[in-house]
Amino acid sequence: MGEKSRRKGPAPRHADGKLGRTCDHPYAPWSFTPSSRAPTAWVRPPCPVWASRLQEHSPEPRRARAPPTRRAQAALYAPALRLRDHLDRFSILMTSCTSWLQAPQAPGLCRDEQSSRISVPQLSGAPILLPDLEGTKLSNFQESSPLPHKHERKDKRSTPEEEGRSAPEKIIQSLKLCPGGHRPASLSSGCPAGCRLSFNLPPSMLLSVQKCCMPSSLKTC
């Protein structure tokens, strides 16, 4: 069977039946060759650079960086120039947007350009309510104004002349026909549907209609 060994596992054997031991230590693993018994061809000589560094025990001093070339400077400063160009373009766009906001949105509706301008407080999202409109139910608006995706028309008696009119003219005409024009349209029962529809208009047109609803300007509107 062979000699017993303190090493784990079966003992490797050569073809001639002898144990293949490379180290005489009893606890050394099989095929373990210490550096003292290894051939000289297996041992690589240490790198002279690393050997000198290990002997010195001091890091190599860093070299001073050379100034960047013109191409590197252009690459560094190019994004800043591009950002400045974009900022100029954004300022032009903002100027055009503010000028558009100050332009009259519905001139000729009540024959007053100043009343149809959009001001900054109106763009803040605050609700714009007509006088005596607080406390009214939302169903008053939902009954008279169908959803945008419903194309059915409730009033089938409209003539081609009424279809050709613009929305502000229809609203003003309904305001003239509304009994008791000084009262809010949603509170009057005999008021046509177009009068209640006026509260779903944009803020600029809503203010124009509000001015038209006043008894003093109802005659000239």
From Swiss-Prot:
Residue stretches of biased makeup (Basic and acidic residues): 13-23, 155-168
Compositional bias ranges of the Basic residues kind: 1-11
Region (Disordered): 1-23, 139-169
Disulfide bonds: none
Protein name: Putative uncharacterized protein LINC02693
Organism, scientific name: Homo sapiens
Lineage, broadest ranks: Eukaryota, Metazoa, Chordata, Craniata, Vertebrata
